[in-house]
């Protein structure tokens, strides 16, 4: 359907189609669509984890249609929903006429993508570049898990799109740091090679879940933790710089902790990744190894 419509596509991290639809997909779709809201948005499948889906609540000019097996609109505002088996519904549509890129989004996206790739090269130790590098290694797994907001946003915008990664799960929400490692272990329980990417506060909040490791089937598991010294998303929120230092500390919860002791406590191999070259440690992981990879980005490059 996407290839027939030839319209711009937001290939959500959890869709399993990011790589297959790369020729139609928008890079940094959240920002691009906020600045250029489409007149019509067609959602196929489950509710996306991308930020723009939440922004639709405040963009009533965009008419939303959903085709979903659950019947759940995923929006608090009015929208149209078609419920049923996706394959049957799409087959019933028959041939569709191409719509094309009526708003010129792909042209704008092309410029953004070129700039993004240049920045990833010039800032190799930024959070964004580290997520790109981590995604390249994670592509060899049969399961990928993302939690909470920033890992999901980064994956949508910066993860590799060359190697298909069909089994991607994500969890985010108002209490999004709760139970994320538990969620990863549950998702990966039957996987032979699985990868997860979470934030530092998220990992601290559920680190005791790693006690479950001996109860799981054998398999290689890599838990990637972005340690940016606190809740990095709260540093980037609009108006964050106008708060008092005390309020910023309450929001960000800054810390100087390492995750090495947590890895040792639960018998995991610990890897510290501070530079692009440090990712070489992920090249040859032992079979059935349990790894905690602490990604420690450069804040100046990130900003």
Description of each model-found segment:
Residues 1-65, 163-189, 193, 204-211, ...:
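Glycine-rich, anion-gripping cofactor-binding loops and their flanking helix/strand elements
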Residues 1-21, 142, 154-158, 220, ...:
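Redox- and metal-dependent alpha/beta enzyme cores, enriched for Fe-S-associated oxidoreductases
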Residues 14-15, 46-49, 70, 149-151, ...:
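Short glycine-rich anion-binding loops that position phosphate/pyrophosphate groups of nucleotides
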Residues 23-29, 79-94, 255, 269-275:
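Short acidic-hydrophobic, aromatic-tinged amphipathic segments that line or gate anion-handling sites
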Residues 42-44, 66, 146, 196, ...:
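Redox-cofactor binding/interface segments in oxidoreductases and associated redox assembly factors
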Residues 64-103:
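Terminal amphipathic helices with adjacent charged low-complexity linkers/tails
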Residues 107-191:
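Active-site diphosphate/adenylate-binding microenvironment
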Residues 154, 159-303:
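Thiamine diphosphate
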């Amino acid at each position: 359907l996407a290839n027939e419509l030839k319209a711009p596509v937001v290939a959500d991290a959890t869709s399993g189609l990011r790589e297959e639809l790369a020729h139609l997909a928008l890079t940094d779709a959240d920002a691009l669509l906020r600045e250029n809201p489409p007149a019509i948005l067609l959602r196929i499948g489950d509710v996306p984890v991308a930020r723009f889906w939440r922004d639709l609540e405040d963009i009533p000019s965009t008419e939303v249609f959903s085709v979903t097996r659950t019947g759940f609109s995923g929006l608090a505002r009015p929208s149209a929903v078609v419920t049923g088996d996706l394959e049957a519904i799409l087959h019933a549509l028959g041939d569709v006429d191409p719509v094309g890129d009526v708003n010129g989004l792909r042209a704008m996206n092309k410029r953004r993508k070129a700039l993004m790739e240049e920045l990833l090269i010039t800032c190799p130790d930024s959070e964004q570049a580290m997520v790109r590098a981590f995604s390249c290694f994670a592509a060899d797994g049969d399961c990928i898990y993302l939690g909470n907001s920033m890992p999901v946003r980064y994956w949508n915008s910066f993860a590799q799109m060359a190697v298909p990664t069909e089994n991607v799960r994500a969890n985010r929400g108002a209490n999004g740091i709760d139970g994320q490692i538990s969620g990863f272990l549950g998702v990966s329980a039957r996987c032979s090679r699985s990868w997860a990417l979470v934030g530092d506060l998220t990992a601290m909040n559920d680190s005791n879940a790693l006690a479950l490791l001996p109860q799981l089937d054998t398999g290689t598991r890599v838990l990637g933790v972005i340690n940016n010294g606190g809740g990095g998303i709260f540093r980037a929120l609009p108006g964050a710089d106008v708060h008092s230092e005390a309020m910023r500390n309450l929001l960000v919860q800054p810390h100087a902790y390492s995750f090495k002791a947590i890895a040792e406590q639960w018998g995991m191999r610990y890897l510290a990744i501070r530079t692009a070259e440090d990712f070489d440690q992920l090249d040859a992981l032992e079979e059935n190894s349990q790894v905690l990879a602490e990604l420690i980005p450069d804040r100046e490059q990130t900003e």
